């Protein structure tokens, strides 16, 4: 019997993922539970703005919860494009009005799934970020009493912003991750970026 291309690629990747998954150091830390046997549903697909709205998922919570333990949803923060799948994030802490619904609908969906014993996992984006009104003006956001404001030093010096005429030059370190031309690549060696990402997660 011939293996499908999917099996040839995905099975080794899944095995590698399992080998590389970190374990919790102590009880109560954020980590995948030991011996977890649940099943997760990807609650969206590309350009699924209508089918994956928070209200649509919530309306199907009872049925979905009878089959799945976790629902994976796209990034819930406001993005720079409209509509957007959430992979061009602007806000991390303060604006949860996305192409999938508003913050009240998001909270209601999470609460409903929780009543059925089903968790929600959000796809978060921390490799790159967009500004609120231009390429680099990241909004100042306050979370748990602390205000986070990233500047040009948070953007990798080899980001495409550096090649734009009339734009200020980013002053962060060279990119340590994947270059994404649609947003500003964040300098993850910068302590301010690290602190904001930890708070966001």
PLM-predicted stretches and their roles:
Residues 23:
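Conserved N-terminal glycine/acidic-rich loop preference
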Residues 10-19:
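Bacterial N-terminal signal peptides
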Residues 1-10:
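Bacterial N-terminal signal peptides that target proteins for export
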Residues 26-31, 35-62, 66-201:
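Substrate-binding/active-site clefts of carbohydrate-active enzymes
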């Amino acid at each position: 019997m011939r293996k499908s291309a999917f099996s040839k690629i995905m099975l080794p990747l899944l095995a590698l993922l399992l080998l590389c998954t970190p374990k919790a150091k102590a009880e109560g830390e954020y980590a995948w539970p030991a011996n977890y046997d649940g099943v997760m549903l990807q609650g969206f697909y590309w350009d699924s703005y209508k089918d994956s709205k928070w209200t649509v998922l919530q309306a199907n919570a009872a049925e979905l919860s009878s089959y799945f333990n976790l629902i994976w949803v796209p990034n819930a923060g406001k993005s720079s494009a409209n509509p957007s799948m959430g992979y061009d994030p602007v806000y991390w802490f303060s604006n949860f009005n996305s192409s999938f619904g508003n913050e009240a609908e998001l909270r209601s969906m999470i609460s409903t799934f929780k009543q059925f014993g089903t968790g929600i996992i959000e796809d978060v984006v921390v490799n790159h970020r967009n500004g609120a009104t231009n390429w680099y003006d990241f909004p100042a956001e306050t979370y748990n009493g602390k205000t986070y404001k990233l500047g040009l030093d948070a953007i990798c010096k080899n980001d495409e912003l550096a090649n734009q005429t009339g734009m200020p030059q980013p002053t962060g370190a060279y990119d340590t991750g994947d270059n994404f031309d649609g947003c500003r690549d964040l300098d993850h060696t910068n302590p301010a970026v690290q602190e904001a990402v930890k708070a966001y997660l």
